[in-house]
Amino acid sequence: MTWNVWGRFGDHWLRRQRAIAETVRAQRPDFLALQETWRSDGQSQTDQLGFELGMSSVFAPSRMPRDPDPDVRLGLGILSRFPLRAVEQHTLSTGTVALRAEIRLGEDSLHFITSCLDWEEDHQRERFAQASSLASLVSELKDRGDDVVVAGDLNAPPDCPELDPLLAVLDDCWQQVYDGVTYSSHNPYLGHGEWLEDQRIDYILANDGLVPTDSRLVGFDEDHGHPPSDHYAVVADVPVS
C-alpha cells in the first residue's frame, strides 16, 4: 500500500490523520509507504501509525512542499508487519531521497522502497534523473536475486518519458480495470487547475517475479464523507513466496 498523506495541510489535519489510520487499519497491508508524512517535536506520523497498528516504522526527511509551520518537517515513511532487517536512505538528487527497508522473508530478502519525485511541472529533467537513480538501485538489488518493490508518488503519469528508466526494470502492479486516477479533480482538497490533476501518479512497482492478483484505490470518503488526503491510496495484493 502507498499513500501521499498530505502532511498537516488544510484545516482538519488531525481529523484527517485519524481517518488515515482507520483506512490503513481496514486494509491491513503488510507494507505501507507514506509520502508527505510529518515529523515535529521528536514525534512522527509514521511512528504514531506504527504504534496504533502494531507495525515496525521508519521515517526519513526528503524534499517536499514546505509546511506553513517551520517546526514541521515532511518526508517519507515505511511501515511493515515484519521486522525491518536493514534501513537505508539513498540520495536521488539534492534534497530528494529514497527510503529503503530490507525485510527478511524466510530465506529471501524483500526490499521495499519509497520516494516522492519532484512535483514541479518544469522539473522533467530532475524527475528523469531521480527515476534513473532509482532504477540503478533496483537493478543492483535484483542482481543479488532479491525481490524489490517501489511504492510512492512519482508525480508523473505512466506514459511520461521521465518514468521510462524505472518502468524498464520494474512492472506496474496496477491492474488495468479502470484508469486508477490518484490525483483527482473530484477530490475537494485539490487546487483548481493543478497540472497533474486527473492523472495516475502514485504507484506500486515490483520485479517480474512478483505478480499482483488485485489492485485498488482507497481513501475516497473515510473522513466524514471527505477523503483523508489530496491523493487517493493505492493497494496491490502481491503474493510473496
Show which residues each predicted segment covers:
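Active-site beta-strand/loop signature of hydrolases that rely on acidic residues for catalysis
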Residues: M1-V5, I20-Q43, L79, A101, ...
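Acidic/histidine-rich helix-loop elements
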Residues: T2-R18, D67-P68, D118-E126, E194
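Active-site-proximal segments of metal-dependent phosphoesterases and phosphodiesterases across multiple
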Residues: G10, L117-L134, P158-L167
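Structured beta-strand-rich core segments of catalytic domains in phosphoester-bond hydrolases
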Residues: H12-W13, F31, Q35-L117, T213-V218
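Short, well-ordered secondary-structure micro-motifs
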Residues: W13, S44-Q45, P70, H123-R125, ...
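Extracellular/periplasmic catalytic domains that process cell-envelope and extracellular macromolecules
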Residues: A26, P70-D71, L105, W195-D198, ...
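Metal-dependent phosphoester-hydrolase catalytic domains
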Residues: S139-V148, A156-S241
